[in-house]
C-alpha cells in the first residue's frame, strides 16, 4: 500500500500563488500525518515542485529542508519535480504572457528533471543541480535503486 501526499512546497506564498492543490501546511502537522499513516503499514511519499518563475533560492531550500524533516518522521520517499506548465492552467498562461517558456517548449514531453522555464529567479542549471541533490539527499538508497530499475531502456 502506498500514498503520495501533494505537499508541493513548504512555502505558503508559493502554494497560494501557484499550486492548484492549496494544501495548507500551516493548518495541520504534516509530520504527525506521516507518522499516523505509517502506523497502518502504508508507504508514504511526497511530491514537491521547485523552480516557479519567482521562487527564490531560499524558498527552494525551505522546501528541501521541509522534505528532510518529513524523512525524519518516517517518510519513505520524496519526488522533486521542476515546474512544467501544462496548457490550460494559470501558470501556463502566466509563463506564456511573461516570456518564461522557451521557443522549443513542448508540454507533450514531460521532463520533470529538466528546467523547463527561462527567466526564473534561480538559473536553469542551478535548478537542475538543486533538484538532483534534493532527490539524492531526501531518498533512501532502496527507493533510488527501485526507481532506477523502472527506467525504460532506449533501443
Predicted regions and their residues:
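A structural motif corresponding to the C-terminal lobe/cap of the Radical SAM core domain
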Residues: 1-153
Amino acid at each position: 500500500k502506498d500514498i503520495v501526499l501533494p505537499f508541493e512546497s513548504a512555502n505558503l506564498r508559493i502554494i497560494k500563488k501557484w499550486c492548484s492543490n492549496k494544501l495548507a501546511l500551516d493548518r495541520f502537522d504534516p509530520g504527525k500525518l506521516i507518522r499516523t499513516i505509517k502506523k497502518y503499514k502504508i508507504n508514504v511519499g511526497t511530491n514537491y515542485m521547485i523552480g516557479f518563475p519567482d521562487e527564490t533560492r531560499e524558498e527552494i531550500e525551505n522546501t528541501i529542508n521541509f522534505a528532510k524533516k518529513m524523512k525524519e518522521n518516517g517518510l519513505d520517499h520524496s519526488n522533486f519535480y521542476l515546474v512544467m506548465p501544462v496548457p490550460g492552467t494559470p501558470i501556463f498562461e502566466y509563463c506564456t504572457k511573461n516570456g518564461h517558456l522557451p521557443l522549443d517548449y513542448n508540454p507533450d514531453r514531460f521532463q520533470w528533471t529538466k528546467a523547463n522555464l527561462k527567466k526564473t529567479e534561480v538559473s536553469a542549471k542551478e535548478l537542475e543541480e538543486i533538484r538532483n541533490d534534493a532527490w539524492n539527499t531526501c531518498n533512501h538508497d532502496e527507493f533510488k535503486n527501485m526507481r532506477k530499475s523502472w527506467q525504460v531502456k532506449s533501443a
